[in-house]
Regions:
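Short, Gly/Pro- and small/polar-rich lid/capping loops
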Residues: 1-27
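Metal- or metallocofactor-binding catalytic centers and their adjacent structured scaffolds
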Residues: 5, 33-34, 39-110
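Conserved, mostly hydrophobic/aromatic
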Residues: 31, 37, 99, 112, ...
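Residue-level marker for buried hydrophobic side chains located in beta-strands
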Residues: 40, 178-180, 229-230, 251
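Acidic active-site catalytic centers that drive phospho-/nucleotidyl reactions
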Residues: 43, 100, 105, 181, ...
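Metal-dependent enolase-superfamily TIM-barrel catalytic cores that perform enediolate-based chemistry
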Residues: 115-225
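Catalytic alpha/beta core domains of metabolic enzymes, predominantly
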Residues: 213-253
Length: 253
């Protein structure tokens, strides 16, 4: 298989803000894996570059390093390909994900079937997704929601869980469930007292409220929260799985 990468820059409609950072432009690589004139596609995003070892230069370097290995492999068994790639690039999860996706896509295209069928899965039915609203002034966050009506759920970035103004204003414009995301920026003392109010406002999921190192706080929250608590930044590999299983109700994949 032959690999090619195309660097892209995606300008956000609105500057993407969370409790951790602001991103006006998202850089990424579109990764192609080709065999016999057929191409599969994947994507590697330069996101949280220090945390995930995912700077664009590093992504390019890892792809160049793995290209000779791919040249000797075929797409007939994507799971075997992934094991070979992981052994060679254990510290490059975004490149691994892009190549894994592309190889699965390539195999399905070579077979002439949808990906779900190539994986021997049932046909997808009634897939649901949420629309994410980045951190901003309250009026702008309401504007972002009103630009995208009708979603099954809205994930809302919040700087402070104790400030319910944003959720109260958003609730005036939709009956859809809310997911709230702290992006590692909250504290247990601010979150615990407002759990009943968050539940009353239709919050169905709390994502990564505390820093990655705050395992005790997260375990305590899980014990007391009527709302499921989901890991994001706390899991970067299977080595984090046991700790996350104890501290969280689920994982954002």
């Amino acid at each position: 298989m032959r690999v090619t990468a195309h660097e892209i820059s995606l300008t956000q409609r609105h500057v993407w803000r969370s409790a951790r950072e602001a991103i006006p432009v998202q850089r990424a690589l579109v990764v192609e894996v080709e065999q016999d004139g057929v191409t599969g596609f994947g994507e590697a995003s330069a996101f949280m570059t220090a945390h995930y070892n995912s700077g664009v230069d590093q992504l390019h370097a890892d792809l160049r390093r793995i290209a000779p290995l791919l040249a000797d492999l075929g797409p007939d068994d994507p799971f075997a390909v992934w094991r070979r790639l992981f052994a060679a690039l254990p510290d490059s999860p975004f490149v691994l994900a892009a190549l894994d996706t592309a190889v699965h896509d390539l195999r399905a295209r070579l077979l002439g079937v949808p990906l779900w069928r190539a994986l021997a899965l049932d046909s997808p039915q009634e897939l649901r997704s949420s629309f994410s609203i980045g951190l901003d002034e309250t009026e702008m966050m309401v504007h972002k929601l009103c630009e995208r009506p009708g979603w099954a759920a809205y994930k809302v970035k919040l700087a402070d869980p104790g400030d319910l103004t944003v959720l109260e204003e958003l609730r005036r414009h939709t009956s859809a469930p809310f997911y709230v995301d702290g992006n590692c920026g909250w504290t247990l003392s601010r979150l615990l007292p407002v759990l009943p109010a968050l539940q009353d406002l239709g919050v169905q999921l709390i994502e990564q409220p505390f820093p990655r190192s705050a395992w005790w706080d997260t375990r305590t929250l899980k014990q007391h929260s009527p709302i499921p608590v989901i890991a994001d930044e706390s899991i970067t590999s299977m080595q984090d799985f046991a700790a996350c299983a104890e501290a969280f109700d689920g994982i954002n994949v």
